[in-house]
Design a protein with these regions (language model features):
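Short amphipathic alpha-helical segments, especially helix-boundary/capping motifs
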Residues: 1, 24-28, 79-82, 123-128
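Mg2+/Mn2+-dependent nuclease catalytic core
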Residues: 82-84, 89-151
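Charged, glycine-rich intrinsically disordered N-terminal tails and low-complexity linkers that flank
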Residues: 1-62
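Detector for Asparagine
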Residues: 3, 40, 45, 49, ...
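Phenylalanine-focused residue identity feature
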Residues: 28, 37, 53, 64, ...
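A short acidic/basic microdomain associated with nuclease active sites
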Residues: 60-96
Length: 151
């Protein structure tokens, strides 16, 4: 069997927007120039720190209470590994020869034990209308695909 193909949600999005760019990246290791996402990284870290604070106390985040989310941040010994860009979570299919993986932002646990994979997104808008944004722009569809990949 040839080398296993590593896939991630970023790979899927890259393929959907530019198949040639994806092949250049995956097969020939030629990467397009990219912009730094320092603001998003900072927001992710702030959110992770807040979730960790409530995770240690086994309490819901105040926003969970405000928005009637029946959950607490999931307490698991591997949470830091799952959230790391270098390790993340992986599903390996030996039959299809691929490794699909990526880092998550957080996991929450509902009172019935069900887990919710959470992905934090930042916006500069004061009033964010998800339905309007989803219908008007393409980028939210990538977020939806991302969450579907976690299922």
């Amino acid at each position: 069997m040839s080398n296993i193909i590593k896939l991630s949600r970023t790979t899927v999005e890259k393929y959907l927007s530019c198949p040639r760019c994806c092949v250049l990246d995956k097969k020939f290791k030629i990467k397009p120039p990219s912009l730094p996402f320092t603001l998003n990284i900072a927001v992710d870290n702030l959110c992770k720190n807040e979730f960790d604070y409530y995770r240690k106390r086994n309490k819901p985040h105040p926003l969970f209470l405000k928005h009637d989310i029946d959950a607490v941040p999931f307490n698991h010994e591997e949470i830091d590994q799952w959230r790391s860009n270098f390790t993340g979570i992986h599903y390996i299919s030996k039959e299809k020869n691929y490794d699909f993986g990526g880092a998550i932002d957080d996991v929450w646990q509902k009172s019935n034990g069900e887990l919710i994979v959470a992905d934090v997104k930042a916006t500069s808008k004061n009033n964010f209308d998800w339905a309007e944004t989803f219908n008007k722009y393409e980028y939210p569809k990538a977020y939806k695909r991302q969450l579907e990949m976690y299922q």
